[in-house]
Amino acid sequence: RSTPIKSSAASDVYKRQTSFLSLSLGFSTAVMIYMSFANLFASSLQTLANIHGKDDGTLHSTLSFFGGIVLILLIDKLIPHYENPHEMHRVEEMSLKEERKTEIKPQLLRVDVVTALVLAIHNFPEGMVTFLAALKDINIAIPIACAIAIHNIPEGISVSVPIYYATGNRKRAFWLSFLSGLAEPVGAVIGYLILAPFLNDHVFGVIFGMIAGIMVFISLDELLPAAEEYGKHHHTIYGLVAGMAVMALNLLMLC
């Protein structure tokens, strides 16, 4: 008799969790998009216009913006469809696919390693983006870091679940996901070491334009679809409105 009650309770908990996740992802989407256009791209325009003049500065900023989109698009295209953390997959789909993989023992290691490497490649530019933004303005970097942290939650799930299904080992799934996540601070250090000798106002203007493009692409390609997938449409909209309001208030307070 208690089974229906337990099922109902579990269903309610699941709905609350997915609703909160949908709200959070909508919030993160708004933060990243609003930040991209109202702050990053605007900073890129102003910086490059001061150096090259209004017309050439606008051209350089626009090219930087779409250059960032092309860069993250190429990274996505180089990663196989199923193993790409940007691609949405249902749990049932992952379960069936991983069950088929577990039938062949030698493939288990490949599943683990490839999945971890894919997430590491994906996280690398995110760490670089956050760190370089912090070098210029910590007030820009903090919202970026928070938005990236939120969007990494479903991404981590999409990586750890297939590993768990492939190996049946929760610790292995956790540690491989954790190690692949370390690519972000590594990306920050390597990005700084490579770009440090060249950092000037022009480079920062280009970088901010590219960061804006990357963040807009990630928001539209990953966060918004994930928000719709995990919860109801209106929860996503509530999150979007709240995220824009918070960012607008934050920028007004900084003025």
Predicted regions and their residues:
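Generic transmembrane alpha-helix signature in multi-pass membrane proteins
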Residues: E99-K105, D112-I150, P154-T167, A173-S177, ...
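Interfacial loop-to-helix junctions that mark the boundaries of transmembrane helices
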Residues: T18-S24, L48-L63, F198-I207, Y230-H235
